[in-house]
């Protein structure tokens, strides 16, 4: 998942950023097959294209980033190797999708979140289990785990057969503001990465979970075009700030609005 930058990248002076429509972990290693029972692989039904990842939060619901959305989505659970699937792999399709706003009017720093209701529940198994929602917000300095089937390089699309994982740090929001001047004064996002560079989510990792001190705290949203670049951390939708919206939707209150 995490990208190790070559020396040439360190000489690049351009500071640019772009949404990670599907990101991969740079600088990481293959995830342990038993550490990501909640990780979901997302595909576009019509094209078969891989769209990113999500997290199973209960047997009927998946939480991911809004920009991973396609008209009809296929979701695979219990997946590690794409070529040699686990025997307990399960496949579902999206029944309903919910966004903070009906017109999907999210931005890079706000409302990049989507709830997917499955066409039928998945069953817990050796490689499938939901991830609990947070009961408290994360603390700056926390060690956070990122994971996904995203590209292993930011210079070419190299999608791995298995998910990669890496550890990064939860940073101050001001660290992201310094890297990306367009960011507003306040945002319902988390800033996370390694300021020295070398580890990051990248294309193909979008929608995957940011797990801080063992708790689901963020959703991979966007970051630098040069994944893992020095002082260009990533931005993650803050799950804790959207708990009321998430829980209300699941309870059947589809008229609930996201926090401002």
Swiss-Prot record:
Propeptide: 19-24
GO cellular-component term (any): extracellular region
EC number: 3.4.21.-
Pfam (any one): Trypsin
Glycan attachment points: 105, 124, 172, 213, 255
Tissue distribution of the protein: Expressed by the venom gland.
GO biological process: proteolysis
SMART domains named among the record's database cross-references: Tryp_SPc
Annotated family: Belongs to the peptidase S1 family. Snake venom subfamily.
Protein name: Snake venom serine protease KN5
Organism: Trimeresurus stejnegeri (Chinese green tree viper)
